[in-house]
Amino acid sequence: MAYEIVYESESKRYRSDCASVLTKTCEILKSKNIIAQFSLVGSGAKNLITRNGNGPYDLDYNLVVIKADERYRKDLRLLKDTVRNALNKAERKDFFSDAMDSRSCLTTLLHFNDSPNVEFSFDVAILTKNRNGNYMRLIHNKNAFCFGYDQYTWNEVPKSHDVKEKADAIKAEGLWQEARDR
């Protein structure tokens, strides 16, 4: 099978559904003293979504924690579980399955017609910013041996501060395609 582009007319509904679920998730988190905002990233943000033939495709989102009570900052497992539970609660009336905890994100699947086949999924990475302005991604090291199993850590995304401003400057100079080709 060859990869094909998913047309905007098809992906628009899923983007809308995901935005609705993530808006509800942020409202639930706010009631638990976690202020967060989400953004579509990756191929979905660029309208370049692909899939293998008629197979499923996914969208990727970042959920940036702007402010949270100290208990969440000290207990990253609690933070990820709270986000996962809020996501599950927000999607209860939809067709999505409960979010699954993977290493660097929460994954939610969509099934149709009581079929085991996955039609669509979306991934939510949990991030925050450090003092340098770089993003930090919440990682669940399920098999980390050095500090025991089930370690939760923040992993810095290098040179991630002011990413939008950097991209805008490259585009303004007419060098965007050259940067993409590298």
Where does each model-flagged region fall?
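Active-site nucleotide-donor binding segment shared across nucleotidyl transfer reactions
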Residues: 27-59, 63-73
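Short, charged/polar micro-motifs that form catalytic or ligand-binding hotspots
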Residues: 8-15, 69-73, 77
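Helical scaffold of the NTase/Pol beta-like nucleotidyltransferase catalytic core
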Residues: 1-40
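Predominantly extracellular/lumenal beta-strand repeat domains
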Residues: 48, 66, 78-81, 90, ...
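Right-hand nucleic-acid polymerase module
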Residues: 102-105, 115-182
